[in-house]
A protein has these predicted regions:
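Alpha-helical linker/hinge and terminal dimerization helices associated
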Residues: 60-61, 82-104, 306
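Hydrophobic hinge/microswitch elements
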Residues: 150-151, 156-160, 165-166, 217-277
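Short helix-boundary/capping micro-motifs
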Residues: 28-46
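A short LG(V/I)-centered, amphipathic sequence patch enriched
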Residues: 58-77
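Secondary-structure junction motif
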Residues: 122-123, 201, 210-231, 299-307, ...
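Central regulatory/effector-binding core of bacterial HTH transcription factors
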Residues: 110-171
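A late-sequence structural motif
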Residues: 276-319
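Flexible hinge/capping segments at coil-to-helix
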Residues: 174-211
């Protein structure tokens, strides 16, 4: 099937003109790679030709879109706006292609989902993939789990359709749907002389205990920092770890204890070859897990199907 390579949009004077969609793709690659030179290599085109495409885009929109420097390129305010719309346009074109190809058949298309690490969301990835493949084999699921990305920004830019993350907003351009409250648990080796008790362990009793936690920008660390500050308890972080598997091995080896949401605490206990103490923390530390989508761009049919599966899986965690 022949796919149209142009989109119709208004020029600076408001007159509808045709734009080669490849220019939008090229613009996205330039921004994502951070360099026109790298983008030219990735796109397998000459750098002067790519620069001409960028110049044509800037002429069309009547604004400078990128600022070049020795460090690479950065977007202007106009560039941010064009980047966001370019992502949406290309996603809609891809979905139109998938819908046309699957007309009369099952759902098809690409759906991007962000799952925040160190949370129940991170434990759902395999189940989400399995259920999506089982129910909608035509859907290409793109899962990302990263501490270095701002998922809300990626949703606004059209790079993600949805994300499970902590917080309830508000963030302009993103709609938050609270779906789960996560309680935090202490996980420690028996050598730390913490009793295996069903009762919550007081934060005050953890004064000076060596802890393994994520860096300060991580939501887990912020929640723990707040709890220790409020109870005027000395927080002793001996290492900052952002890899759950490494964290599990370190806790199991007695290198330090940790405080994590229940889903991650359970995973650490299950992966350890050593018996570990796992107790709820008091005063209670908890964070709200929300399903986030754009409040401006409606979800595609495939994305709605994936959203339904996500809600089913998180409902199981509550039970």
């Amino acid at each position: 099937m022949r796919v149209c390579k142009h989109v119709s949009c208004a020029g600076q004077n408001g007159t509808p003109i045709l734009m080669d969609i490849r220019r939008l793709k090229s613009f996205i690659v330039i921004v994502d790679s951070g360099s026109i030179t790298r983008a030219a290599d990735l796109l397998h085109i000459a750098q002067p030709a790519l620069s001409q495409q960028l110049a044509a885009l800037e002429e069309h929109f009547g604004h400078k879109l990128l600022i070049r420097s020795q460090q690479g390129v950065s977007m202007t305010d106009a560039g941010h706006a064009v980047y966001r719309h370019a992502q949406i346009i290309l996603r809609q074109m891809e979905q139109a292609q998938a819908d046309a190809s699957a007309a009369g058949n099952s759902l098809a298309g690409r759906v991007s989902v962000g799952l925040v690490p160190f949370s129940s969301a991170a434990t759902l990835s395999v189940d989400l993939l399995a259920e999506t493949r089982k129910r909608h084999p035509g859907i290409l699921l793109h899962l990302t789990e990263s501490v270095g990305q701002t998922y809300s920004q990626m949703i606004m830019n059209g790079r993600l359709e949805m994300a499970l993350l902590h917080g309830t907003g508000p963030i302009k351009g993103v709609r938050f749907e609270p779906i789960l409250s996560e309680e935090f648990f202490l996980v420690a080796h028996r050598d730390f002389a913490i009793e295996a008790d069903a009762k919550p362990v007081s934060v005050n009793t953890l004064d000076g205990i060596p802890l393994l936690l994520p860096p300060a920008y991580n939501f887990v660390r912020r929640a723990v920092d707040t709890a220790f500050t409020r109870t005027r308890t000395n927080l002793k972080v001996v290492a900052e770890v952002e890899i759950v598997r490494t964290l599990a091995r370190a806790v199991g080896s007695g290198l330090g204890a940790t405080i994590m949401p229940k889903a991650i605490a359970d995973r650490i206990v299950s992966e350890s070859s050593e018996p570990l103490i796992c107790r709820l923390v008091s005063p209670r530390i908890e964070e709200t897990l929300s399903l986030c989508v754009s409040d401006q761009n409606p979800l595609s049919e495939p994305a709605l199907a994936v959203r339904d599966i996500l809600l089913e899986l998180t409902a199981r965690l509550k039970g």
